[in-house]
């Protein structure tokens, strides 16, 4: 007998009007194309103040969290998301909240995370209890997804202003900038939790930050939310301009502290929010601009949503005008369905929420009849034969329908979910699949009776017969290659020769190398491995030769072996299995003896 579960109530956002109505308010898409919208990138909670970080082949996105039904900036915690393809985002929950800082009382507002010294530092503005004014704290973690802890037990900066951003220059000097109505900076020490000297106010001149009219006390366009970075020798300060409502402007300089020159508008006044907040990165050969608006049901100035656009710098380094869209950034590569995928990795979700899972990480919960998850660009290759899911239910469960192209598209499988005796009492269920081939948008549609049906932790497809689901590592894996055991010699006078391993018929792989970043004395490369054969790969191995004296210092999404200038990168535990026609990537950092990276011709072989 299952105990009667307590009622589970969805938040106000998910009980709101259909998302399409709200999206069309900021879009010129026709109804036929609007169904493919991927902005805002999070739909089950309100998010604001995006701060992206590129680390080990993924984008980690740190956001604020607007509470449902807010009539002010009611924010109690911060959230983390990550993606390798810019469209399917994994929810990592809330590793930092006001309660992390014993000295803070309210207002978990816009912050930023930077990586240094093997750690991750999160700079955030909060209200200090002792002064009842805004101060900037710093939290630290060993992982980009936390958990974070208060690094110093007190404010780092406490002059009543907000919106910290941190930039580390090429010489290793780190700068903390912040401010509204002023713009300040300090030089951080190498420990990233203290600074030298005193805070310096950056002159807000009209030449540096544009001209505002009608407000004698604030003659420039600068409002708040600075985002400072360097690209190709140019220092950029992108900021929220001239409230209210705000647009995004930017200035450039030849040094990290100015003098700044105003360059114009990045994003015009758009969307249903009177604020905006920028975040800019380069990732996987492209440039991306993050922002927020009020596009979700019930959205507005106090209930915002983070979105992203891909853009290209002008040839002279200036930033083009970027408009809000509902289509968002294009997908990078495809998602591998044959490795375990978290249920909370989502391109678009309807009706669902997430919560911490007893097995670690997060799970999708509060699932009701008709809710669904969209996972974009799933590379099925020649076809999946079965599907497994990790589920839990304190009621009688329901069904996971596997559909292609839309929530009502072709059904390729249907998995029954039983009652398991509790919302965190997990069980793995499996079902056959037929017709899932090529690259498809996968819709996991949930059906059943009334009320909450079940929770959903992870899923995995199998190709060519039923296999045991394999574990997926955390978003920043550090795979350790299994050493090859030393064989024991056979004590016979004439040992039997060991046969040369042969590759099964139909197995083949191809690889391309792309240089995605360069600097004096080094470069970053990306290896794209594709199953070019007719049957699934169980693993792959890439080899290439560097010029004499050059070495690879780091690899992610793979395991590294070096012998002299001969480099071998093998698959990690989670990305070796590739269906025909599907791809995966591995990245590496290498030294370079010249200003231009060497020409590398890698080869790939099945493992």
Stretches with model-predicted labels:
Residues 19, 140-142, 602:
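Short, basic/low-complexity N-terminal boundary segments at the transition from targeting/disordered tails
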Residues 80, 320-325, 329-341, 346-348, ...:
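Extracellular low-complexity, O-glycosylation-prone Ser/Thr/Pro/Gly-rich "stalks"
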Residues 2-36:
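Secretory targeting and sorting signals
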Residues 26-38, 462-468, 501:
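C-terminal region of N-terminal signal peptides and the immediate post-cleavage residues
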Residues 36-413, 421-465:
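Carbohydrate-active catalytic/glycan-binding domains of CAZyme proteins
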Residues 8-11, 34-38, 43-44, 502-508:
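Extreme N-terminus of proteins, especially the signal/transit-peptide cleavage junction
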Residues 14-17, 413, 507, 602:
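Secreted/extracellular small peptides and ectodomain modules produced from precursors
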